[in-house]
Amino acid sequence: ADNDHQEKHLSVFSRKAPYSYGWDWGIRMVTSGIWRPVKIRFYDAASINDYHIKQLSLTEHSAELSNELEINNILPQSIQAEIRINYSFEKGEETVISRSVTLQPGLNSIHIPSEVLSPVRWMPNGWGKPALYDFSAQVVFDGKVVAEQSHRIGLRTVRLVNEKDADGQSFYFEVNGIPMFAKGANYIPQDALLPSVTTERYQTLFRDIKEA
């Protein structure tokens, strides 16, 4: 609220980004209304409310993952469905895992394990390639895909190292077992009116940051 450029600090009464009320780098412009595309989604039998790929372990030989889904069965009765997990690396050969499940009416939590052999690790900027895997989850009912959700993920380990040393205690990060000097900067909105920021402006800015 202290950043509010108005005498009466009104920002505490609304759920908006604080910078809308002014900052040392920006004007006060409290906007309202629809500013992103609106979509209406229709479902025949079920929807995937959430899909998360949890990394359980990572070695040079394999990555053990858990595909965690929250599926909403919108029908009034339980249904037999098939859950398909598809994943590939750099649009290469696709691996498919299939499991038959009973979906009760309402929300259902489903956990499906998967394994990536000889995983290629994601690496930070300047260290190597930021390798990404494509994952998708599908709900199949009566032979038809009724819901689908996709993600791109990187496989890597990150560890905060707090160990006693000559000066007291260390504080640094290891990424994939390699000590990393973390550096960065604050990113602020590129315009007081966010819809005026084009995809090209975002791409140009973050490309410049990456190459700096």
Name every feature range the model reports, one short phrase each.
Residues 1-212:
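Secreted/periplasmic carbohydrate-active enzymes, especially glycoside hydrolases
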